[in-house]
Amino acid sequence: MAETSIRNFNINFGPQHPAAHGVLRLVLELDGEVVERVDPHIGLLHRGTEKLIEYKTYLQAIPYFDRLDYVAPMNQEHAFALAIERLLGIDVPIRGQLIRVLYSEISRILNHLLNITTQAMDVGALTPPLWGFEEREKLMVFYERASGARMHAAYFRPGGVHQDLPEKLVEDIGKWIDPFLKTVDDLDELLTENRIFKQRNADIGIVSLEDAWAWGFSGVMVRGSGAAWDLRKSQPYECYPEMDFDIPVGKNGDCYDRYLIRMEEMRQSAKIMRQCVERLLGKERVGPVSNMDGKVVPPKRAAMKRSMESLIHHFKLYTEGYHVPAGEVYAAVEAPKGEFGVYLVADGTNKPYRCKLRAPGFAHLQAMDFMCRGHLLADVTAVLGSLDIVFGEVDR
């Protein structure tokens, strides 16, 4: 009988694929149903953000950051604002810090709700996304009531936040927390001990801690492998040192552990939010929400009607913008997906000389080949879901 040579089978996964989370194209080399090679093709959502930022003043560059990881927009603005504040040497008043932390944690919950529920949908559970989007809708309303926009808020400004929160809004956020924890428990009940969900995620995409560091992982990907590394604790910024919360850590480094960590992180975020709400309604009830330096933060409308200097400041800030002293700085925040960093080079003008964005998803996506090799085709979606990739920040 004549020998037939068996060759591997190449297929495209995406860019139009429901589990590809946007515009991912993976070229998979399959031996039967076993994945031999994964080749991610990125750049389909490249918009030249880093170059565009160089042609905008520091204030005008802020909206670009919302459009990177558009699932949790305010966390990126936060990193950019911190970078500028370090170069300018200004600090944020405590009420402004509390509002920032409150909204950073809202963003984290927005992100984890989407990720957990769509990961469940990728492996076949159809109920969680409906619950997740219901809660996300309420959070988007909180975004809208603070900044006027549901997603691209441009709310964090260098020096603080754009506007103060109405008391009613802070109270409503406080009232939202307990029903939300009930929803998390319902999700927990539906997925955590679910036999099918466990079979699809446990022991899939295992990453040892050494490999996690070597691939440049951060965030949930590192904590899933057993390191308690969270920038909110290890390199604290804003008023996180004053907050009481725990860092969930996995021990197997598989998709299931990463799912469990995200579930617990939502509870911890709610805990941080509760502390912020208590302080915003308690001893930090009144106070400035942004730095009072008129050379950086625009004056209030009321002041502009009375004072010529305020009017001049306002005009200069919105036409020319403030000049940032020459220097370079790296500021990183613990975004929901990992360490989101901004490396900013200032040359003393009103525009950044260079702004490099360190997107956590980029490092995670490049390990796709390493994580999927030897797994089955059906496991690719499970691994991809647990990486938590959004293409706005990967392609920039």
From Swiss-Prot:
Reactions catalysed according to its record: a quinone + NADH + 5 H(+)(in) = a quinol + NAD(+) + 4 H(+)(out)
Mode of membrane association: Peripheral membrane protein
Disulphide bonds in the chain: none
GO molecular function annotation: NAD binding; NADH:ubiquinone reductase (non-electrogenic) activity; quinone binding
Enzyme class, first EC level, given as a word: translocase
Family matches, as Pfam families: Complex1_49kDa
Entry superkingdom: Bacteria
Subcellular location(s) of the protein: Cell inner membrane
Residue ranges crossing the lipid bilayer per the database entry: none
Keyword Nucleotide-binding: no
Keyword set, alphabetical order: Cell inner membrane, Cell membrane, Membrane, NAD, Quinone, Translocase, Transport, Ubiquinone
Quaternary context: NDH-1 is composed of 14 different subunits. Subunits NuoB, C, D, E, F, and G constitute the peripheral sector of the complex.
Record-given protein name: NADH-quinone oxidoreductase subunit D
Organism of this sequence: Chelativorans sp. (strain BNC1)
